[in-house]
């Protein structure tokens, strides 16, 4: 018999053990690896964006079963980085003497949408500058060629995913502030929110 209030243990008894365990946050202090947040049909999830430079001639490769919109986000992120190399402290020769691969793990799962834009910017800039990503921080937001951070949907589900993964700081578009105000305080306890308008603000918060 089961108690009237269903617990996690009851769910396992009824449905069996989970098919897989969601990977917990594990990328703090690394170069080129950034934690993003995604919305899925079954709720929010964390999403890692990885990028790495290899000797080459400036080729940009995108891997991880990405949809067209997500590929466009990666292209925009890289173009913005190239256009702002001086402010970012990047040697422009790196663009000519290296290829960059931008990868989103779990390649068997299709991924699309614009909300990983600022995550891709952060990953790319981290790889070109060698600056590490701060620990326990995640982000979600669309970016433009002008470097503006646009709002995204599914914020509540993404926030819950961040809490499950042990994230403590979140970067969102200033225009998503109203969405956080609608979430019950107990759901966001222990989280610090940073609301931004530009890519530069994202990088200042996310990179060491």
Feature roles, as predicted:
Residues 2-11, 17-35, 42-208:
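Peripheral, non-AAA+ core regions of ATP-driven protein-machinery
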């Amino acid at each position: 018999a089961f108690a009237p209030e269903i617990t996690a243990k009851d769910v396992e008894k009824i449905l069996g053990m989970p098919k897989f365990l969601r990977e917990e946050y594990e990328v703090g202090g690394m170069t080129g690896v950034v934690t993003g947040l995604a919305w899925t049909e079954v709720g929010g999830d964390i999403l890692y964006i990885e990028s790495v430079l290899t000797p080459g001639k400036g080729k940009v490769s995108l891997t991880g079963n990405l949809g067209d919109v997500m590929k466009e986000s990666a292209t925009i992120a890289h173009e913005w980085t190239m256009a702002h190399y001086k402010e970012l402290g990047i040697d422009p020769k790196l663009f000519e003497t290296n290829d960059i691969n931008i990868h989103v793990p779990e390649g068997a799962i299709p991924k699309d949408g614009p909300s990983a834009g600022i995550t891709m910017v952060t990953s790319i800039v981290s790889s070109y500058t060698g600056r590490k990503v701060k620990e326990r921080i995640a982000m979600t937001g669309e970016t433009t060629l002008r470097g503006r951070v646009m709002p995204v949907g599914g914020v509540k589900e993404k926030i819950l995913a961040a809490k499950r993964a042990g994230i403590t700081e979140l970067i969102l578009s200033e225009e998503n502030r109203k969405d956080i105000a609608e979430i019950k305080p107990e759901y966001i306890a222990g989280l610090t929110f940073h609301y931004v308008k530009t890519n530069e603000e994202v990088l200042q918060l996310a990179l060491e």
